Regions:
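Helix-to-loop junction immediately C-terminal to a conserved catalytic motif
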Residues: 50
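Helical segment within the ABC ATPase nucleotide-binding domain
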Residues: 172-185
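ABC-type ATPase nucleotide-binding domains, specifically the catalytic core motifs of the NBD
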Residues: 14, 70, 95-113, 121-123, ...
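The feature captures the beta-strand-to-loop junction immediately N-terminal to the Walker
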Residues: 35-37
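ABC ATPase C-loop
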Residues: 149-150
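Conserved ABC ATPase signature
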Residues: 132-136
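Conserved ABC transporter NBD signature motif
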Residues: 58-66, 78, 111-115, 131, ...
Length: 234
């Protein structure tokens, strides 16, 4: 079953079209990476899926419903979680307050219970609950952003460059944690990533973008050197 079906979408910044006639499908519970050189529209695609940028043509169907005209908060309530590039935690709020922000809009959510559940995946945060997010290392900030995303148990997580500016040992931990989250919760993961080693470790499937559209796709195990040279080498 597909949780996400994107059909022939266009996305523009003013008069400049960035995404053109792009289509892709993502299976429920899968782990998928979007690859491509800088400037091909990967971040723009994620922003259009979460509703930050409007699409000018095509359709976006999430969990059986057309969400193309929904606002970002409506897509969030429908089950789309998002961790943007740069993490965008609130630096003057504590770790605990940042996590509580993730639960806003969910009146039936028992915050302390869900916080304990989320921290089980990111236990390093437990020692920092009363520290401001802005003083944490990049690795801890990324873990906080991911914990804040999963605290409401989204159906799908959109992650934009989750390894950016993070030490290799923390990158490896995040890779294993994302795989564990997907396996134990059934949350679908769709990420944009430049780190090919990380992408291969986390994702089962890939899409490659070039000039604002998808030009290749398949299983990450089958991503060969020729395809990498053609579409990803600088």
């Amino acid at each position: 079953m597909n949780i996400l079906e994107v059909s022939h979408i266009d996305v523009s910044y003013g008069k400049s079209r960035v995404i053109s006639d792009l289509s892709l499908t993502v299976s429920s519970g899968s782990r998928t990476v979007i690859l491509g050189r800088n400037g091909v529209g990967k971040t723009t695609l994620l922003k259009s899926l979460v509703g930050i940028l409007p699409i000018s043509a095509g359709s976006v169907v999430f969990d059986g419903s057309d969400v193309a005209k929904q606002k970002p908060y409506q897509r969030s309530l429908s089950g789309i979680g998002y961790v943007p590039q740069g993490r965008e935690i609130i630096p003057l709020l504590t770790v605990n307050e940042n996590l509580e922000l993730g639960s806003l809009g969910r009146p039936k959510l028992r915050f302390e219970e869900k916080k304990a559940w989320a921290l089980d995946y990111f236990p390093m945060l437990k020692a920092h609950l009363n520290r401001n997010g802005g003083v944490l290392s990049g690795g801890l900030q990324q873990q906080l952003a991911l914990a804040r995303c999963i605290i409401c148990e989204p159906k799908m997580m959109l992650l934009d460059e989750p390894t950016e500016g993070i030490q290799p040992n923390v990158v490896a931990e995040i890779a294993e944690t994302l795989k564990r989250i997907a396996a134990e919760t059934g949350i679908t993961i769709l990420l944009v990533e430049q780190n090919l080693k990380f992408a291969r470790k986390v994702a089962e499937n890939y899409f490659i973008m070039q000039k604002g559209t998808v030009v290749a796709s398949g299983l990450t195990d089958g991503l060969d050197d020729e395809t990498i040279r053609k579409y990803l080498s600088v």
